[in-house]
Amino acid sequence: MSPPSQDWSTITDANERRKAQNRVAQRNYRSRQKLRVELAEAILYDMPSWRTAVGLKRKRWLETPQSVEDHDTNPDSATPKPSLSSQVIQYHEEGQLVQNPTDFSMSADADVTADVSSGGESSDLSLGVFTPGDDWMNAEIDWTAAMTLAGDTSASEPDLRHRAVGPGNDIHAQPPVSIPVQAASGQHRTLTAPTPAESMSLRTEPPETAVITVTSNREVPNLGDSNEGSRSISTTKQPSEFKTPVLTAIAKGKLDIARLLISSGANIDTRDMHGRTNLHYAVSRSDAKTVRSLLELGADLLMSDASGVTALHMAVGADDQDMVKLLLGWCEQQDRTASSTDHKTTLKQCINSRDGQNMTPLHLCVVMERMDMLKILLDYGADVNIGCD
């Protein structure tokens, strides 16, 4: 048990003095919290929806007007704590509210506490005068109805609910329940009380995990209407591409392991459900290192997905000039090292390939008005006469 404030000077140990001060501060905090709870029960006593919750405490308010903190009151104090029920609420014999809860203020005479930095000297903690505020609101009580009963019509219902719940919590939409209430002035008002589900929803809940699908919109040529220069298509990016041992080896930079797997029968051009290969995904990520490794291991650059889109179409659509130069440069190198003239057609086939709409990368670039990309394709010999059917 902590010593009185006048005996703190006898405690020479700083840790013991600090513990004693903390105990007094905690006792004062509990005292204030109990006062606030009693005040809330008094305000809501005449509300029909809450009569059951506080009905058992009516007798204490009417017949036993004593401080709720008698056990914490300093016995040496000349002025004991005032009775909360005598200051806050007065009732007729019928139990009707006759004093407006907002017309009074309550002064909390806190116990004497000590300042830790004062070296053991005690200082009085004066709380001053406080009125019902946001700091003691209970989220499970309908404070909208309480404020309306008290005559506070300056704030709207959403604002009052914001006070009760706080800015960080959400209120689930529930059908409100209307209840009639008779105020002290005799006027009948209709208040909105929360449903049980709404009361439960006022408590803070952890956020739920959401699954997000990333969608990118790109402008591509509109072949159906010659008056429009472009159209927008939605390309949904899968959360993760399919993985194979070969691709794992490439991702780790172990091309010797990848070659061993390929020589053992591994297919480097395995398609997924959309017809895309590892090369398609590497190009879409602008992963030049993986693209170069896949091409060196024999990936087919001319393979298209279910929509007829090749890796070059994908790079042109993304306006990835470096990737386009990498793909076309690799095709040009393949043609230079080809043994016969018949096999020197890789660049031509790649740059003039058509997608599902019979569009070449050059045609796609023209419709999307990408001048720099168009110059790159022309430098590599793209055919300007190939059109759509």
Curated annotation (Swiss-Prot):
Region named Disordered: 1-27, 65-84, 219-239
Ranges of Polar residues composition bias in the record: 1-13, 75-84
Gene3D superfamilies to which the protein is assigned, alphabetical: 1.20.5.170, Ankyrin repeat-containing domain (1.25.40.20)
Coiled coil region boundaries: none
Functional description taken from the UniProt entry: Transcription factor that regulates the expression of the gene cluster that mediates the biosynthesis of apicidin F. Binds to the eight-base-pair motif 5'-TGACGTGA-3' called the 'Api-box' that is found in all promoters of the apicidin F cluster except in the promoter region of apf2 itself.
PROSITE patterns according to UniProt: ANK_REP_REGION (PS50297), ANK_REPEAT (PS50088)
Protein localization: Nucleus
A single Gene Ontology CC term: nucleus
Name of the protein described by the UniProt record: Apicidin F cluster transcription factor apf2
Domain notes: Contains a basic DNA-binding region at the N-terminus which is usually found in bZIP transcription factors, but does not contain the characteristic leucine zipper domain. Instead, four C-terminal ankyrin repeats were identified that were shown to confer protein-protein interaction of regulatory proteins.
Keyword field: ANK repeat, DNA-binding, Nucleus, Repeat, Transcription, Transcription regulation
ANK repeat start-end pairs: 241-270, 274-303, 307-336, 357-386
Region (Basic DNA-binding region): 12-38
Pfam family, one: Ank_2
Deleted gene: phenotype: Leads to the loss of apicidin F production.
Species: Gibberella fujikuroi (strain CBS 195.34 / IMI 58289 / NRRL A-6831) (Bakanae and foot rot disease fungus)
GO molecular function (one): DNA binding
Lineage of producing organism: Eukaryota, Fungi, Dikarya, Ascomycota, Pezizomycotina
Keyword Transcription: yes
